[in-house]
């Protein structure tokens, strides 16, 4: 199933869990040797990854990227094994209706399982080129005009920049959060005369010097 950016979804029907699958962003600038899938079906998954190179390396898209001086997407990398969690509907638990804004399908899926409304926003990418203000405006519209009690805005840009070791764009992303997300929300709610609570909570650090969590 096609997702966004480098995150896509492989569904293995009747598969087993317990594999050792290395997240690619944990081994930036490191060798992949010794980090291929391990476990009951590890050899099968590793073979899929190796065979994908044969299919993708000479693909017209990759030939064009190489010609343009870009890195080719010449293989798949399997990681992030999991099963569908059983989450309770938050609105039924607390009587509060919520929404979620994100470009990351994993986060979107968690919101759906928790009974949150998915708020689609044009121009969001999950990276530093996302529409920061568009996210804030969509959240404010949903809260002020569409009956929602809370909205979770997921912004992945600083994390992605950290994984790339891109300090300049990480700083830029944080500045955009401050200047275009928080500032927009404050203005919208204050102009509407509404009481509001804003919670800003990072879930982990991603230092540019180590490119991982």
Give residue ranges: language-model regions.
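Feature captures the catalytic ectodomains and active-site-proximal regions of enzymes
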Residues: 1-213
């Amino acid at each position: 199933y096609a997702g966004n950016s480098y995150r896509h979804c492989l569904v293995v029907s009747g598969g087993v869990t317990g594999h050792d699958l290395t997240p690619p962003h944990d081994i930036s600038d490191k060798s992949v040797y010794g980090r291929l899938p391990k476990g009951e079906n590890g050899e099968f998954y590793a073979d899929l990854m190796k065979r994908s190179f044969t299919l993708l390396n000479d693909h017209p898209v990759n030939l064009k990227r190489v010609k343009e001086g870009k890195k080719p997407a010449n293989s798949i990398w399997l990681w992030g094994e999991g099963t569908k969690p059983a989450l309770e509907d938050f609105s039924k638990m607390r009587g509060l209706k919520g929404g979620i804004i994100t470009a990351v399908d994993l986060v979107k899926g968690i919101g759906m399982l928790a009974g949150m409304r998915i708020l689609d926003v044009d121009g969001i990418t999950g990276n530093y080129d996302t529409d920061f203000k568009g996210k804030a405006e969509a959240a404010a519209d949903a809260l002020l005009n569409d009956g929602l009690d809370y909205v979770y805005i997921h912004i992945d840009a600083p994390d992605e920049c950290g994984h790339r070791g891109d300090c300049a764009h990480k700083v830029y992303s944080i500045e955009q959060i401050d200047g275009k997300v928080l500032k927009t929300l404050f203005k919208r709610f204050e102009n509407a005369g509404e009481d509001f609570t804003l919670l800003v909570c990072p879930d982990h650090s991603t230092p540019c010097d180590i490119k991982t969590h």
